[in-house]
Amino acid sequence: MGDWMTVTDPGLSSESKTISQYTSETKMSPSSLYSQQVLCSSIPLSKNVHSFFSAFCTEDNIEQSISYLDQELTTFGFPSLYEESKGKETKRELNIVAVLNCMNELLVLQRKNLLAQENVETQNLKLGSDMDHLQSCYSKLKEQLETSRREMIGLQERDRQLQCKNRNLHQLLKNEKDEVQKLQNIIASRATQYNHDMKRKEREYNKLKERLHQLVMNKKDKKIAMDILNYVGRADGKRGSWRTGKTEARNEDEMYKILLNDYEYRQKQILMENAELKKVLQQMKKEMISLLSPQKKKPRERVDDSTGTVISDVEEDAGELSRESMWDLSCETVREQLTNSIRKQWRILKSHVEKLDNQVSKVHLEGFNDEDVISRQDHEQETEKLELEIQQCKEMIKTQQQLLQQQLATAYDDDTTSLLRDCYLLEEKERLKEEWSLFKEQKKNFERERRSFTEAAIRLGLERKAFEEERASWLKQQFLNMTTFDHQNSENVKLFSAFSGSSDWDNLIVHSRQPQKKPHSVSNGSPVCMSKLTKSLPASPSTSDFCQTRSCISEHSSINVLNITAEEIKPNQVGGECTNQKWSVASRPGSQEGCYSGCSLSYTNSHVEKDDLP
């Protein structure tokens, strides 16, 4: 497809020149032709179309267009449109047959191209639809892959959980097997122990049977009796049986059975009596603890050592009751514990009653306020309540006794009772061991408390001795300071001691019967002391000494005042305790004399309680 210039005749117009130049300069190719055909087909059919096609070939450039077409067709492999000329100078002529054949071939090619184009378009549509289908399938498969991955992850997690559960179950199974093995070993050991105990019991039973047989036979041999010469027949007229080995063995068995039944009956009665006594003692102990339970004290009352010991004893007994049950112990340990606890409670009750008596006597003689003393009506009400509680307790004890009798009335077989007793022997042994260790600990604690109590008693004795020495020196000084003696104003006021012959001045009684004279005063507000001693010489053994000591204290000082009044002391009662002893000490708060007197009184009361124990 060349760039060639056509030779135009000079007669051609300018328009044909431009067309020939355009066609000669452009590169013509089948693709360009096809594009031109498409463009031509796309142009709407109008007058411009006719003008466009007529612009290529006109009447002026027919030869040029034919030559151009011939050249193009030859380049595409079509035969030439001109006939072959014989001479060079002769003009070539147009071959119409060749032109028609070329046109036909061009039309065939056009149809083929159109069919191929349609086929390509249909194939393209098919491929597009296939592509869409494949894309949809791809998206679906991708979603299925994601879901399958999620399901696989869930299944893996579930598999892991199941494996963990399986491992735990294997571990539990192993533990259960170990526990079963341990239990089997324990059962085997207990079975061997039970067989051993059974054999031991059988040996003991055989020994006891032999011992009983020996005792019975020895009694028969040693028994002094008379032989009957003329045997009197039986009342029913039957003849007595001969004594043979079988009859003697049968009689011995019957005798053993009768003896064993008697022993069992007696043992049941003794057990019933022990149970009843245990219940009665336990009820008594509970009632005593409830009676002696520490009440709320008034703020005016002072707490002394004796009340502290009472509260501690009650708390210890309550702790013992909650710690162990009396029914599980043996008779000896129960008896010892109950007797000790009842003795303690009895001491506490005795001291409590003595304190109440002392309080009542103090109220009557010293004129305390009615608020600090229990009234008679309250006392009677309390006694009535206690009587009602005692009646209720008695009824409860009766009902318990009836229930116990009903339970024990149901007779059990000897074999079952023996088996039950044998079963509980091991538990009783273990319980006894534990109780023995607890008893040892209690004994150690008791010894420790006893040592501390003895040390406290020794300290109290030393303090008391020092106080007695100080008081003796003070009394000696007061006695030496006595200067005036007045025999006319002496009254029947007698000095005595609660324990005559001892130096227990805490039990002295203070009581002034008549108003005393005013003491002499000293200038500048100094304390004035006036002491009068009236002494009458004994004319006969029945006369007694009269003494009055009075210490007068200045208005500005607040020291202790001790007024002493004594009753007549008989000569034959020297060294013994005096009756109707009352004491009262009016002291300021913080005075040492009142504290020492209270300590000595509690100490003497505790000694009296120990001496009065049953």
Curated annotation (Swiss-Prot):
Widely expressed, with the highest expression in brain, intermediate expression in kidney, testis, spinal cord, liver, heart, lung, skeletal muscle, ovary, fetal liver and fetal brain, and little to no expression in pancreas and spleen. All specific brain regions showed intermediate to high expression, with highest expression in amygdala. Also expressed in fetal tissues, mainly in liver and brain. Residues 131-227, 266-293, 374-460 form a coiled coil. The modification Phosphoserine is found at residues 290, 293, 312, 536, 540, 542. Its main location: other. The keyword Metal-binding does not apply. GO terms for molecular function: protein domain specific binding. InterPro entries: Adhesion_Centrosome_assoc (IPR052300), Afadin/alpha-actinin-bd (IPR021622). PANTHER family: AFADIN- AND ALPHA-ACTININ-BINDING PROTEIN. Both the N-terminal (up to position 79) and the C-terminal (from position 304) sequences are required for interaction with SSX2. Interacts with afadin and alpha-actinin. Interacts with VAV2. Interacts with SSX2 and SSX3. Does not interact with SSX1 and SSX4. Interacts with PCM1. Interacts with WRAP73. Acts as an acute myeloid leukemia-associated antigen and may be used as a potential immunotherapy target for leukemia. This is Afadin- and alpha-actinin-binding protein. The gene is SSX2IP.
